[in-house]
A protein has these predicted regions:
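Flexible coil/loop and intrinsically disordered segments
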Residues: 1-129
């Protein structure tokens, strides 16, 4: 699992990422919206870089959920049982832009957490049928 906003940022970066203090940061860092998938080797090599510096790695990831964070992505299924499910996922997953300081910010963590939770709810309850 990859933390989009690194869990090891400098104290001076808390405000730049939209956090009031260290406690505010700790309350957000492990939310579902701050996680994505990367292979262990990619995760290790990306280290504690800022979000703006991770985007190219995300674009080249084998994981579509990680690609879409960095660039728009569509997966079209024209017919079949999974058409509505794929359309739901495409509609709910968004591309994100670093804040003015290059971070995946507190606001983006909150937004993406809500979006991921909504998508999971709709998938698990089959609300897309």
């Amino acid at each position: 699992m990859e933390h989009i906003l690194s869990r090891n940022i400098d104290l001076s970066d808390y405000n730049d990422a939209g956090f009031e203090n260290q406690q505010d940061f700790k309350e957000h860092i492990n939310r579902i919206g701050n996680f994505t998938l990367l292979y262990n080797t990619d995760n290790s090599s990306i280290g504690n870089k800022m979000f703006k510096d991770k985007i190219e790695m995300y674009k080249s990831s084998d994981f579509k959920i990680t690609n879409v964070i960095a660039e728009p992505l569509t997966t079209e299924v024209k017919s079949g049982m999974d058409t509505k499910l794929f359309n739901l996922i495409n509609d709910l997953e968004k591309t994100y832009t670093p804040n003015e300081n290059g971070h995946f910010s507190k606001l983006l963590i909150e937004q993406r957490s809500e979006e991921v939770a909504n998508a999971l709810y709709k998938i698990l309850t089959k609300e897309y049928d």
